[in-house]
UniProtKB/Swiss-Prot annotation:
GO molecular function, one term: autoinducer-2 kinase activity
Function (record text): Catalyzes the phosphorylation of autoinducer-2 (AI-2) to phospho-AI-2, which subsequently inactivates the transcriptional regulator LsrR and leads to the transcription of the lsr operon. Phosphorylates the ring-open form of (S)-4,5-dihydroxypentane-2,3-dione (DPD), which is the precursor to all AI-2 signaling molecules, at the C5 position.
EC numbers on record: 2.7.1.189
UniProt entry keywords in alphabetical sequence: Cytoplasm, Kinase, Transferase
Listed name of the protein: Autoinducer-2 kinase
Coiled-coil region(s): none
InterPro entries on file: AI-2_kinase, ATPase_NBD, Carb_kinase_FGGY, FGGY_C, FGGY_Carb_Kinase, FGGY_N
Statement: the UniProt record of this protein carries the keyword Cytoplasm: yes
Main localization, broad class: cytoplasm
Catalytic class of the enzyme: transferase
Domain of life from the UniProt record: Bacteria
Organism of this sequence: Yersinia pestis
HAMAP family: LsrK
Subcellular compartments: Cytoplasm
Length: 530
């Protein structure tokens, strides 16, 4: 839990509920976008015995944790519940919740649930192996992470739940439902089910019918920033908010994060550096990738979509390197009172650009249709300790993350015609000054780093404010509230060097994938059914 700023000229505040993969937060903002206080709690997803890949979302415990966070945030902010003018919720995408016909939640799974591999394969075979292409052309999604295979799994193995189901929503919508009693989804999050039309921003029931699934479980669609309902007396008693507080439609975490970063116009580009890295490009109208390498999601801005590529485990790889190899640096950083990553960046800054040719093999470029990665490794190491050491490997990892991002952005530009003129870099990775400069050098465009690097909750609060008329519009408010810390200008000499390094890495990575294909090494990650 944290308390950041308790000074505001206004008596009006907004609350965002942010349901991530590993934790939930309740965050209070003033109307100038300053974070006042936050309550946070970790949560775990539940594997079902004898169901490989299952990760169920604990509805009872997680609502209790959410209520705990709301009360913590109010306490830390020293605010009465009456000061909260509106609340909205955002969440990890792909996670779904089912309700019975009376509106009671009965089953949910997290975004990481991978139980439905067999069902993915079964659905891919429909229409002479053309069903996945039909899904992608309509929704911008493939089957690997979509809701239909999970629903089919329930029909096969939990027909009791499947028969009871009356409505489906996303996890952000479940939070809004627990507060207000109302059921609806927004396009940005529901779009990741693979059942929503990118053009109409509404459900496409015929996709479920083609899959042999029920199409009568689709809830109403309401745009982000639309008033959904009000906090019920029951919810108020449980969570500490005032009964009657407006509850506004939120959305998907990445899209609301882009709103909080002011990435709201066609052509704008962001790299969000967390556990996964997302490369996001706003497109002027729905366009799909003919090679199915890139997912296309509805933005929270009506009429706009986002091309999104994902680099796998980028932040996790850095944490692994720090914890596995940098015990001395962790102790030194502790004594100096600085972050270990800052110390490692200082060391890596003394290594020449190109990291002496060391090539990390971790995440591949995104290939949404056939999504898997090579086995983790370092290639082209030297036995010269002056050239090949922890500083070199750390710099190589930062350079590689930037190279994969640049490759993903190039893929998007190839099919969409939208090429980044600058990049907004946010998330934990953007705290690294060297990393930000490397990203500018590799992409060849200026990189802007915001003051608020974790902007998802801010975007969610903006939606809450728009829903009750405190802000004029989502896009204008996102632009107005974002503040910039620094801009990094690309080094043209480094750009040429990194272009050659990118070409070499792509060739080596292709060979490494071949080792996985032969069963000689183990993939970093594979999509269900591959």
């Amino acid at each position: 839990m944290s308390q950041l700023d308790t000074t505001t000229p206004s008596g009006d505040y907004l609350m965002a509920l942010d349901a991530g993969t590993g934790s939930v937060r309740a965050v209070i903002f003033d109307l100038n976008g300053n974070q006042i206080a936050a309550g946070q709690a970790e949560w775990l997803h539940l594997p079902v015995p004898d169901v490989p890949g299952s990760m169920e979302f604990d509805l009872t415990t997680n609502w209790q944790l959410t209520c705990q966070c709301i009360r913590q945030a109010l306490h830390l902010a020293k605010l009465p519940a009456s000061a909260i003018r509106a609340v909205a919720a955002c969440s990890m995408r792909e996670g779904i919740v089912l309700y019975d016909r009376s509106g009671t939640p009965i089953w949910a799974c997290a975004n990481v649930d991978a139980r439905a591999s067999r069902e993915v394969s079964e659905l891919k075979e429909l229409h002479n192996n053309g069903f996945e292409l039909e899904v992608y052309q309509c929704s911008g999604q493939t089957l690997a992470l979509s809701a239909m295979p999970r629903l089919l799994w329930l029909a096969h193995y939990r027909p009791d739940i499947y028969r009871q189901a009356g409505t489906l929503t996303m996890i952000s919508d479940w939070l809004a439902n627990m507060l207000s009693g109302e059921l609806a989804v927004d396009p940005s999050n529901a779009g990741t089910t693979g059942m929503l039309d990118l053009v109409t921003r509404n459900w496409q029931p015929n996709l479920l019918e083609m899959a042999g699934l029920r199409a009568d479980i689709l809830s109403p669609v309401k745009e982000t920033g639309t008033l959904l309902g009000h906090v019920t007396a029951k919810a108020a008693q449980e969570c500490g908010l005032l009964a009657g507080t407006p509850v506004v439609m939120g959305g998907g975490d990445v899209q609301l994060g882009c709103l909080g970063l002011g990435v709201v116009h066609a052509g704008q580009t962001a790299v969000l550096g967390g556990t996964f890295w997302q490369q996001v490009v706003n497109l002027p109208q729905p366009i799909i990738d003919p090679n199915m390498n890139t997912r296309i999601n509805p933005h929270v801005i009506p009429g706009m979509v986002q091309a999104e590529s994902i680099s796998f485990f980028t932040g996790l790889t850095m944490r692994w390197f720090r914890d596995a190899f940098c015990a001395e640096e962790k102790l030194l950083a502790q004594r100096l009172g600085i972050d270990t990553y800052s110390l490692l960046e200082d060391m890596a800054a003394r290594v020449p650009a190109g990291a002496y040719g060391v090539m990390p093999i971790f995440s591949d470029v995104m290939r949404f249709k056939s999504w898997y990665h090579a086995a983790p490794s370092f290639i082209n190491l030297s036995l010269d300790p002056e050239k090949c050491n922890k500083a070199t490997l750390f710099r190589a990892l930062e350079e590689n993350a930037a190279i994969v991002s640049a490759c993903n952005l190039a893929q998007i530009a190839e099919f969409s015609g939208v090429k980044a003129s600058s990049v907004v870099f946010a998330g934990g990775g953007a705290k690294g000054k060297l990393w930000s400069q490397i990203l500018a050098d590799v992409t060849g465009v200026p990189v802007k780093v915001p003051v608020v690097k974790e902007a998802t909750a801010l975007g969610c609060a903006i939606a809450a404010g728009v829903g009750v008329g405190l802000y004029e519009a989502l896009d204008k408010t996102g632009e107005r509230l974002v503040r910039w810390e620094r801009e990094y200008i690309p080094n043209t000499e480094h750009k040429a060097l990194y272009q050659a390094a990118k070409t070499n890495w792509q060739a080596v990575y292709t060979d490494q994938l071949g080792l996985v294909d032969c069963g000689l090494t183990t993939s970093l990650w594979k999509a269900p059914c591959l």
